[in-house]
Curated annotation (Swiss-Prot):
The keyword Kinase applies. ATP binds at residues 10-18. HAMAP family: Cytidyl_kinase_type1. This is Cytidylate kinase. Its EC number is 2.7.4.25. It is an enzyme of class 2 (transferase).
Length: 219
């Protein structure tokens, strides 16, 4: 198969990262978690007491992705591995706000485009098919019900030892959907040439197989 790029977009907790990792593994491609980039910048924003000088924040930031056999993708922020801090509730509650800021978006998109230049990339996020990789060979827009997405996030938090309330997670996801879809810069939307894939009630294996079947049709 020729080298291709795959873009997976969709709202929070639609299963993008889980599926992107699995697809990348099955196809021996490189997985790039763009959400982790925005989470890392949000982590720094919180460490800086919620600074509003986002241009200065990114100007004084180094951000790299590395891969370790035992952890997979790791996020190195200012020479520190911050991977284990990126899923805490405080970061989750602020990431949409930070990611909506133009300096932050420009900084991250530039890095994402650089990573995908050689192809062979599976990338997931909110604006991959519309902004980062508009020429991706396959674009999939993943959706799921709010209830299922909240349940996934709740179980994920449990595994990570993060305390959370199911109803609060539902409200947070609904609020984040509205924010992501209505922000001025790179709003969440389906690319015109993307395939919609509803993952509600489906297993990881079922969704992965559906995407692999789409890949097999690429000439």
């Amino acid at each position: 198969m020729k080298a291709i790029n795959i873009a997976l977009d969709g709202p929070a907790a639609a299963g993008k990262s889980t599926i992107a990792k699995r697809v990348a593994s099955e196809l021996s491609m490189i997985y790039v978690d763009t959400g982790a980039m925005y989470r890392a910048l949000t982590y720094k924003y919180l460490k800086l007491n919620k600074t509003e000088d986002f241009a200065k924040l990114v100007d004084q930031t180094t951000l790299d992705l590395t891969y370790k056999a035992d952890k997979g993708q790791c996020v190195i922020l200012d020479n520190e591995d911050v991977t284990d801090f990126l899923r805490n509730n405080d970061v989750t509650q602020h990431v949409s706000y930070v990611a909506s800021k133009e300096p932050v978006r420009s900084f991250a998109v530039k890095k994402q485009k650089e990573l995908a230049a050689e192809k062979g990339i599976v990338m997931d996020g909110r604006d991959i098919g519309t902004v980062v990789l508009p020429d991706a060979d396959l674009k999939v827009y993943m959706i799921a019900s709010v209830e299922e997405r909240a349940e996934r996030r709740y179980k994920d938090n449990q595994l990570r030892g993060i305390e959370s309330n199911f109803e609060d997670l539902k409200r947070d996801i609904e609020a984040r959907d509205q924010y992501d879809m209505n922000r001025e810069i790179s709003p969440l939307r389906k690319a015109d040439d993307a395939v919609t894939l509803d993952t509600t009630g489906k297993t990881i294996e079922e969704v992965t197989d559906e995407i692999l079947a789409m890949v097999s049709q690429i000439k």
